[in-house]
């Protein structure tokens, strides 16, 4: 088992939830956390603990974004008009690697980050290899022609269990996607409940 898979399993067990909706998640078999003390009964969690847990879950879902980068998303979310929690989700879903994942070009958020890093994606006809690049509504994302027959792409295109959300239009024949709008929390197909307002509260302490 790779270190990346081990890290995913550990986070799933710590949260007690199948964060990415994976069939092989350990929480599908048991409902306690990792380690020798994982089976102990847990008491009521403090407000701080609840907020921290919400932050760890949301940050981990997007490929474990660094704390420094996640704080920048928080700062931008509270600067923008409107609900800060909704703004945070919008910023995360505008990440290029998130759009690549949502478009079913690859199977996981982790694979999407690597796919972008390796230069397989164009935005509006220009190669972009920065996973955190902020996609705007109307932008066209394209898998480079030379990359379309890679096994990682072919396998992902056959995943019937994951639908493309309504805010992205995908042409799987041309391997292109267009973001039609920035989504709100209820539009994003998370396998588990995300609580961005608790994340905002965590950083606002």
UniProtKB/Swiss-Prot annotation:
Keywords: Ribonucleoprotein, Ribosomal protein, RNA-binding, rRNA-binding. PROSITE patterns: RIBOSOMAL_S4 (PS00632), S4 (PS50889). One of its GO terms (molecular function) is rRNA binding. One of its GO terms (cellular component) is small ribosomal subunit. Belongs to the universal ribosomal protein uS4 family. Part of the 30S ribosomal subunit. Contacts protein S5. The interaction surface between S4 and S5 is involved in control of translational fidelity. This is Small ribosomal subunit protein uS4. The gene is rpsD.
